[in-house]
Amino acid sequence: MAVMLKPWTVVATVLICVLLCLGTFVDAYPPKPENPGDDAAPEELAKYYTALRHYINLITRQRYGKRSTSEDVMAELLFGDDTEHKQRSRYDDSFMW
């Protein structure tokens, strides 16, 4: 016999899954360093500026490698991946005699 789930249990389960998925995206970036305040000691300010520089370098670092342009992505979605046509040689198709 089939068990009928109550609508609120399904909604609660989906909500918990969404919150867990969003939690993984939050951990993707490092936390921003906290400002020590206006009356902080010079050592604390130097430590803060070092941490801030490291934070900025992490979130703005250059990523190397081939980038797809939006036109390439749209063409691939519309027309499919045509890499097999580019890689094939004309001698791959042998004629049947």
From Swiss-Prot:
Signal sequence range: 1-28
InterPro entries (UniProt xref): Pancreatic_hormone-like, Pancreatic_hormone-like_CS
Keywords for this protein: Amidation, Cleavage on pair of basic residues, Hormone, Neuropeptide, Secreted, Signal
Protein name listed in UniProt: Peptide YY-A
GO cellular component: extracellular space
GO terms of molecular function: neuropeptide hormone activity; neuropeptide Y receptor binding; type 2 neuropeptide Y receptor binding
Superkingdom, natural source: Eukaryota
Expression tissues: Mainly expressed in brainstem neurons, and in the telencephalon. Also expressed in intestinal endocrine cells.
Chain positions listed as propeptide in the UniProt record: 68-97
Modified residues annotated as Tyrosine amide in this record: 64
Cytoplasm as UniProt keyword: no
